[in-house]
Amino acid sequence: MTLIDEIRVKFKTRNYEFSKHAVDQSIIRDISVAEVEDAIAGRSEVIEDYPEDKYGPSCLILGYTKGGRPLHVQCSYPSRPLIAIIAVYQPDPDLWIDFRIRK
């Protein structure tokens, strides 16, 4: 099973938690929990991998809500009992090529 498939399973079974930072970001940026779930469950892909991240391995996922809104979700690897959602934001097209590659 691929990394994104393992993450999708954790999300489907609601085995995830939001960090305080991710909660704050989602409120400020008007991103709902349902949108984050949609973005992971739908056509999503790991676009950056951070195996040596400061607080443990994590990755950046690009996904789209049911309404087509692109979201970036940084989360821990699925090896933890609960995936930690570290950051959530709508990528700025001025900073990203196709929301996948940093300019």
Q: What residue spans do the PLM features occupy?
A:
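Ribonuclease/tRNase effector modules and their secretory precursors
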Residues: 1-103
